[in-house]
Swiss-Prot record:
Record gene name: rps27
Organism field: Xenopus laevis
Native organism taxonomy: Eukaryota, Metazoa, Chordata, Craniata, Vertebrata
Cofactor binding, per record: Binds 1 zinc ion per subunit.
Protein name: Small ribosomal subunit protein eS27
Listed cofactors: Zn(2+)
Keyword Membrane: no
């Protein structure tokens, strides 16, 4: 383990593990994502840390359920992280 550590140029892996406020440039851990319903294949935009149950617009199946942090996707649902 080296004693000299470059604080101005941390590796991307180190930055990801840090708290969102203690990073070199602050950035949130949350994101929006497109979730595809396994039944009717409609796409719904869902927040990653959703605090309520999200239902499909077309067939009213449950797409994700809240946990203490990130929302848990239902089995069979596929998602894609939205670009900002």
């Amino acid at each position: 383990m080296p004693l000299a550590k470059d604080l101005l140029h941390p590796t991307p892996e180190e930055e990801k593990r840090k708290h969102k406020k203690k990073r070199l440039v602050q950035s949130p851990n949350s994101y929006f994502m497109d979730v595809k319903c396994p039944g009717c294949y409609k796409i719904t935009t869902v927040f990653s840390h959703a605090q309520t149950v999200v239902l499909c617009v077309g067939c009213s199946t449950v797409l994700c359920q809240p946990t203490g942090g990130k929302a848990r996707l239902t089995e069979g649902c596929s998602f894609r992280r939205k670009q900002h």
